[in-house]
């Protein structure tokens, strides 16, 4: 079962979907970031877009735009450490509340960054049926959407 699921991860048939709120407004309605990621040479706790790093691909689309913020859906083609956080910051739109790759100060009323896994889809190892799992946005995330919509 583990091998079967690992193979889906490797051949990009396992689908992982996230939602996030980024700072600023993305100009395009959708796009793909295909930029390699590796450890940041200046700070080993961080990851960064680095030539020669491991291939990392994030597909994104705008859900809604607000003054100074954008609600985004991301689909991972690869799965690198902090991939969405690194790629959104690379685009110049770090995730709201991300003090590692974005703002240096915490956002009042937010305990972490506005990034949430909303969906996972894979083929079941034994039954070969398509399994779709979803998880609603947490209250803290939806409260932040209400706050920025004012």
Give the predicted meaning of each segment.
Residues 1-150:
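RNA pseudouridine synthases
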């Amino acid at each position: 079962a583990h091998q079967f699921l690992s193979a889906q991860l490797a051949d990009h048939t396992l689908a992982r979907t996230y939602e996030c709120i980024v700072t600023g407004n993305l100009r395009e309605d959708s796009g793909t970031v295909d930029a390699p990621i590796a450890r940041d040479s200046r700070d080993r706790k961080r990851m960064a877009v680095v030539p020669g790093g491991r291939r990392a691909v994030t597909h994104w689309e705008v859900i809604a735009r607000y003054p100074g913020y954008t609600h985004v859906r991301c689909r991972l083609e690869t799965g690198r450490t902090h991939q969405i956080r690194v790629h959104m910051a690379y685009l110049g739109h770090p995730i709201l509340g991300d003090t590692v790759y974005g703002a240096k100060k915490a956002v009042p009323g937010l305990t972490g960054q506005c990034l949430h896994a909303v969906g996972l889809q894979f083929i079941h190892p034994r039954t070969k049926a398509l399994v779709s799992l979803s998880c609603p946005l947490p209250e803290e995330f939806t409260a932040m959407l209400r706050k920025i919509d004012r």
